[in-house]
């Protein structure tokens, strides 16, 4: 007999319109969870909303707001659309570290800005290549343009208009967070995501608030046309996200208005993607299946 206890079942939360929440193994739609790269759709929406308010233009060059960056043709739109040419991760980040983003502070990002032209793998606008680094740069530019912290500008331009300002946050309220647990029931340590990487993947939210974000942005279009931070596959708009021990998938159909929010604590992020895509493409053609990014 193995001395190890069996693996814990994966907590799951699925929210869909007109259906009772599917909540398994201790998940809770009212508690705060890590949302990973779903943060990006909120950052992209903030860019579009700030442009509509006249605070900036989506085609502003990066150096307009971050003067330390060289004039290399990268615009805020390129950063939002993953066409900037910047690498997936900031230089020196990743590898075998259990907390890869801890060294990526605001000061570290500032030190990288003068090298953006040399860090880009190709000229902006030429190829699409998913970039967490690019969204960190975008977040810094938004902060400079707004003259306020990322959490504050996001609250003003996106969260309050959607009615979810109290349930999407930079840090979870004390006693209201939900985290993955190991075989022996101990809470598992997550990544440090409150530095420069915050606009790329560091937010916390309740699943019920994320459901309101999905329906509000993609179905009701309460803030106008969805930002191109969302990914598109035929008639699907979607995005996913993952941290060390959490994963999420959110999406909606542009033809029927159906939407889904899936969040899991532990397990493989790919399984979260498959479940979310399957729920959105029930009785639909195979061509409509969302092709999730491997990077989050």
Report each predicted region and the residues it spans.
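A short, well-structured edge-of-sheet supersecondary motif
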Residues: 1-35, 58, 95-98, 249-254, ...
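Structural preference for long, well-ordered alpha-helical segments in enzyme cores
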Residues: 46-47, 154-157, 275
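Short, surface-exposed beta-strand/loop "edge" segments at domain boundaries and coil↔beta transitions
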Residues: 245-246, 260, 267-273
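Short, surface-exposed loop or secondary-structure junction motifs
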Residues: 8-11, 16-17, 72-249
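Short, gly/Ser/Thr-rich active-site loops of penicillin-recognizing serine hydrolases
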Residues: 268-296
């Amino acid at each position: 007999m193995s001395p190890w206890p069996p693996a814990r079942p994966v907590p799951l939360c699925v929210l869909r319109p007109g259906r009772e929440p599917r909540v398994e193994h201790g998940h809770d739609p009212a508690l705060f969870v890590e949302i990973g790269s779903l943060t990006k759709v909120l950052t992209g929406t903030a860019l579009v909303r700030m442009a509509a308010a006249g605070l900036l233009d989506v085609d502003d060059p990066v150096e307009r707001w971050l003067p330390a960056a060289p004039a290399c043709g990268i615009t805020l739109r390129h950063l939002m659309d993953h066409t900037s040419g910047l690498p997936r991760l900031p230089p020196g980040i990743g590898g075998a570290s259990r907390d890869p983003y801890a060294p990526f502070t605001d000061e570290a990002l500032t030190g990288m800005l003068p090298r953006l032209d040399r860090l880009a793998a190709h000229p902006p606008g030429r190829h699409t290549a998913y970039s967490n680094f690019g969204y960190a740069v975008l977040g810094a530019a938004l902060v400079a343009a707004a003259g306020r912290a990322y959490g504050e500008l996001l609250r003003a331009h996106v969260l309050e208009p959607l009615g979810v300002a109290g349930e999407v946050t930079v840090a979870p309220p004390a006693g209201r967070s939900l985290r993955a647990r190991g075989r022996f029931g101990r809470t598992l340590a997550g990544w440090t995501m409150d530095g420069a990487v915050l606009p790329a993947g560091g937010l916390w939210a309740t699943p019920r608030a994320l459901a309101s974000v999905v329906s509000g942005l993609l179905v009701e279009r309460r803030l106008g046309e969805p930002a191109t931070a969302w990914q598109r596959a035929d008639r699907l708009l979607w995005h996913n996200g993952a941290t060390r021990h959490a994963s999420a998938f959110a999406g909606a159909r542009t033809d029927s208005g159906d939407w889904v929010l899936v969040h899991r604590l532990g397990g493989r992020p790919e399984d979260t993607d498959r479940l979310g895509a399957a729920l959105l493409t029930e009785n639909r053609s195979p061509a409509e299946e969302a092709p999730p990014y491997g990077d989050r």
